[in-house]
Design a protein with these regions (language model features):
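Helix-turn-helix
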Residues: 1-13
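Residue-level preference for short helical/loop micro-motifs built around acidic side chains
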Residues: 12-13, 40, 61
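Alpha-helical DNA-contacting segments of helix-turn-helix folds
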Residues: 15-22
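Hydrophobic alpha-helical connector segments
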Residues: 17, 28-55, 70-73
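C-terminal peripheral helix-coil segments that are non-catalytic and often amphipathic
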Residues: 44, 79, 83, 87-95, ...
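Short linear capping/connector segments at secondary-structure termini
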Residues: 61-70, 145-146
Length: 146
């Protein structure tokens, strides 16, 4: 415990460091993700972002007990995630594999909303998959349901 307090002035600073480490990991994953197509890479990363969102919920809520939403760690982290993921969305949109009428911010907000749902993966997984299916272009959805 003493080691923690030598490295961090208080609990808030420790929580900020943990949150930032998780953001670093999700940003790095955006650069390293692999997949057969741009849409597959985007979808794979969004699955990782979902897992990040579900796990960071606890750290974020505890951090909010020691600070508020105006803390720069939140806005700076969101900006970094958007910058890291934007190339994935642009590539998938340029390949005409995902809708062009949704922004990355809207997509991330959808994933965050699903990640906030309490439940086991067997419960939340189909909800996430339905959300991700909604990223397909409307013409692709119609032909797939056809």
């Amino acid at each position: 415990m003493a080691t923690l307090y030598r490295n961090f002035a208080g609990r808030r600073e420790l929580l900020e460091a943990l949150y930032t480490d998780e953001v670093n990991a999700v940003c790095s994953a955006a650069e390293a993700i692999s997949g057969e197509s741009p849409a597959a890479r985007l979808t794979a990363w969004l699955h990782q972002f979902f897992a990040f969102g579900a796990s960071k919920r606890h750290i974020a809520s505890e951090l909010l007990e020691h600070t508020d939403r105006s803390n720069p760690v939140f806005s700076e982290s969101r900006a970094r995630v958007i910058a890291a993921a934007r190339p994935l969305l642009v590539a998938a949109q340029n390949a005409q594999e995902v809708r062009e009428d949704l922004t990355l911010e809207q997509i991330l907000d959808m994933i965050i909303a699903v990640a906030a749902i309490h439940g086991e993966p067997g419960y939340t997984g189909p909800i996430l998959q339905t959300t991700l299916d909604g990223l397909r272009r409307p013409a692709d959805v119609g032909s797939a349901m056809g």
